[in-house]
């Protein structure tokens, strides 16, 4: 567990980390730390306007970031029926969410993961992580620790060693208000 503690410490001190998810490796940081998010965006060569996903161990961890008042109970039930799992939902963002996370949108992309290592990290950290695929923009997402080290290693502080859950593709993204699939999973 030495690696886990090392990665948690990096996360707590505002660094960008890499970690296995259901389908591909992700990179992320503290969603409430603008400097950490800037590092992440620079690492990925990703424009801030695109926004980032928040990945959490539980729905409760996401509540401070979501404006539930804009969703019906039926819409919320539809979201909850897919979690935990590889489904990302676009939901109305709360006032707490900075533009560093939401990008150009007034919504936020959120997921409750069923990956045990990510659940453990989010629980130890006490809140969600930002999440985007571990790759440079335009490159294929990394599937293994070795691929992360090859593509991003010299730019990352810590990689949480482990395996993806074997889905071999990024999570499906849906809109909670319309149920529209925005990215096939």
Curated annotation (Swiss-Prot):
Pfam entry (one): Sua5_yciO_yrdC
Segments of skewed composition (Basic and acidic residues): 164-177
Keywords assigned: ATP-binding, Cytoplasm, Nucleotide-binding, Nucleotidyltransferase, Transferase, tRNA processing
Record family assignment: Belongs to the SUA5 family. TsaC subfamily.
GO molecular function: ATP binding; double-stranded RNA binding; L-threonylcarbamoyladenylate synthase; tRNA binding
Catalytic activity of the protein: L-threonine + hydrogencarbonate + ATP = L-threonylcarbamoyladenylate + diphosphate + H2O
Keyword Transport: no
InterPro entries registered for this protein in UniProt: DHBP_synth_RibB-like_a/b_dom, Sua5-like_dom, TC-AMP_synthase, TC-AMP_synthase_SUA5
Region (Disordered): 163-185
Domain YrdC-like: 1-185
Taxonomic source organism: Vibrio campbellii (strain ATCC BAA-1116)
Record-linked SUPFAM superfamilies: YrdC/RibB
A Gene Ontology biological process term: regulation of translational fidelity
Function: Required for the formation of a threonylcarbamoyl group on adenosine at position 37 (t(6)A37) in tRNAs that read codons beginning with adenine. Catalyzes the conversion of L-threonine, HCO(3)(-)/CO(2) and ATP to give threonylcarbamoyl-AMP (TC-AMP) as the acyladenylate intermediate, with the release of diphosphate.
Cellular component GO terms, alphabetical: cytoplasm
Compartments (UniProt record): Cytoplasm
Name assigned to this protein: Threonylcarbamoyl-AMP synthase
First-listed, main subcellular location of the protein, grouped into a coarse class: cytoplasm
Coiled coil location: none
Keyword Cytoplasm assigned: yes
EC number: 2.7.7.87
């Amino acid at each position: 567990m030495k690696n886990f503690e090392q990665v948690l410490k990096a996360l707590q001190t505002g660094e960008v980390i890499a970690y296995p998810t259901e389908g591909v490796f992700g990179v992320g940081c503290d969603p409430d730390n603008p400097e950490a998010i800037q590092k992440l965006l620079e690492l990925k060569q990703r424009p801030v306007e695109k926004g980032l996903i928040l990945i959490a161990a539980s729905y409760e961890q996401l509540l401070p970031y979501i404006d539930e008042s804009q969703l019906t109970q039926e819409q919320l039930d539809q979201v909850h029926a897919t979690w935990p799992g590889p489904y990302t939902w676009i939901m109305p963002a709360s006032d707490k969410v900075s533009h560093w996370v939401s990008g150009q949108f007034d919504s936020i992309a959120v997921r409750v993961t069923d990956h045990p290592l990510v659940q453990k990290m989010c629980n130890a950290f006490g809140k969600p992580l930002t999440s985007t695929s571990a790759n440079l923009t335009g490159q294929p997402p990394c599937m293994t620790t070795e691929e992360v080290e090859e593509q991003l290693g010299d730019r990352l502080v810590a990689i949480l060693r482990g395996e993806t859950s074997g889905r071999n593709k990024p999570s499906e993204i849906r809109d909670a208000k319309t149920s529209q699939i925005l990215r096939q999973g």
